[in-house]
């Protein structure tokens, strides 16, 4: 959504998916394994998009300027290191005395699409286009699970007068789009310390302006104890980790 003329062009998406399939097949042959049956999807990645300064996954930018929050446990050593320079960006997590919120001031890149630029149906039509041109084109074969596809994970921002249309659209295209979450368009005003917060009051603008971060040199960070919890990693579950 930060570069829609390229990233949402159907021909670009199809050609890109073909390149992914060909690359996967070439690498699979080189390392002696079977190529993937499905090679493409779209998933939101908050941390990476935060570092790159882009919107997350298929989603438009929340606003031209907004506050992005991140929750960390109080016992995480990198939090204490961060607070040495940027205590002004942190606040206690409401309802959880063992967690802290970090507030990041975000400004969308020029030309980026925001959620205010799209209707809910317009957003879902974009999801459908990417699902067909990128995700389904990236399917090399469906020999084992016919009809199953990866998906474009998404959260749709819905205005009060759009719910019926959204319901109808999702039902009509239920065989093509899945992984849809729905959020009221003003959801950031309904939830305390929401992940994305528009600047709707003078106080919000003042807060945003005060959140200017001080650069942190994390090369100086040292973790004295290993707090890794293997059960919390994505590849682990049920008390064990998958080894391939």
Where do the protein language model's features map onto the residues?
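Solvent-exposed alpha-helices and their adjacent loops that cap or buttress functional pockets
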Residues: 31-34, 41-43, 147-148, 174, ...
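Catalytic alpha/beta core of large soluble enzyme barrels
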Residues: 44, 51-230
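Conserved phosphate/anionic-ligand binding catalytic regions in large, soluble enzymes, centered on
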Residues: 1-2, 35-64, 240-243
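Internal maturation/activation junctions in enzymes
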Residues: 1-43
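Short acidic, low-complexity intrinsically disordered linear motifs used
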Residues: 227-244
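N-terminal hydrophobic or amphipathic segments with adjacent small-residue motifs
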Residues: 26, 40, 51, 232-233
């Amino acid at each position: 959504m930060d570069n829609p003329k390229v990233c949402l062009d159907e021909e670009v998406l199809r050609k890109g998916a073909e390149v992914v399939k060909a690359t996967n097949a070439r690498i699979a042959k080189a390392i002696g394994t079977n190529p993937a049956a499905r090679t493409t999807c779209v998933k939101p990645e908050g941390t990476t998009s935060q570092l790159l300064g882009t919107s997350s996954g298929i989603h438009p930018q929340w606003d031209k300027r907004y506050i992005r929050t991140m929750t960390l446990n109080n016992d995480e050593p990198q939090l204490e290191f961060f607070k040495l320079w940027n205590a002004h960006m942190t606040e206690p997590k409401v309802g959880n005395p063992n967690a802290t919120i970090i507030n990041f001031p975000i400004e969308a890149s020029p030309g980026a699409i925001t959620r205010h630029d799209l209707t809910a149906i317009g957003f879902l039509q974009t999801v459908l286009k990417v699902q067909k041109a990128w995700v389904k084109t990236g399917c090399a074969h469906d020999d084992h699970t016919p009809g199953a596809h990866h998906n474009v994970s998404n959260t749709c921002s819905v205005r009060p007068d759009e719910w019926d249309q959204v319901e109808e659209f999702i039902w009509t295209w239920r065989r093509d789009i899945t992984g849809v979450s729905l959020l009221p368009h003003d959801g950031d005003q309904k939830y305390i310390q929401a992940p994305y917060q528009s600047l709707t009051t003078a106080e919000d603008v003042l807060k945003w302006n005060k959140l200017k971060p001080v650069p942190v040199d994390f090369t100086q960070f040292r973790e004295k104890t290993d707090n890794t919890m293997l059960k919390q990693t994505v590849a682990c579950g049920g008390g064990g980790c998958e080894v391939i």
